[in-house]
């Protein structure tokens, strides 16, 4: 069983500890910070880093191209939202970047769980319709990557005549596809197209159930791998790790008070994204699941992304990660500035 550790880089220093109004995947660009952040991951032995996506942030293709030139071994997971460039163009862009990065990229497909996010870029399709579009989009992208002859395509969202790309991915049979999404519509599309299905950090029993659901929806015989996003909060002793965790939470709450944001998502708050909603439900059930899966940061921030943590000594957190791996996962992901 292989295990891959994935970090995350942004384009400027940002943290919920200091300013809860800034996005970890958006904002301005600090070139020196980007280079340093990437090198820290490479020198620290991370296998890959996620370059995130938001409707107000820098373009991930350019970020990956820049960081690939500043590193040698580190691989990249480029978040990409279908629907805003043609799938034929996306396929060529990714294949080109695969060559210029010497085969170090993968693409993370995020269809989008927030109508407001989508509408900033002019997308007014509803949630399930967006996933039907993603299905067509990935059909076309994969075919462009692998087809040796021009092809036509007639779908609900895309109609193509003699589509073809002279540039094919360096990686064969194509650039690895990661996929995120917790809804039923997401599972059907992701199980069909992805090489790696990504989850946020939920209790082990829930992860086992979700793995079973994705595998059941996948084509017969497909070899799927799985990723879990968690924030490691480490200490020399377990007591020091929990002290650090509560300090981090207090800093987040203080920064939210200063920004005029309520401390907790509250019972009436319900995000559109199904994954975020699930994390809030687990946080409402209890603060700690499976001995050290800690949920209060998810509750305090509205579960905007990877917001659950594993708390303990390095050895204890490693033991907890091994339990996720033994949930028949092939891939484990650790992300989050708060865990460093």
Language model regions located:
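Hydrophobic faces of well-ordered beta-strands that scaffold small-molecule active sites
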Residues: 3-9, 49-51, 75-80, 105-109, ...
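Catalytic cores of alpha/beta
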Residues: 87-96, 187, 235-245
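Acidic (Asp/Glu)-rich catalytic clusters
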Residues: 38-43, 65-73, 94, 98-105, ...
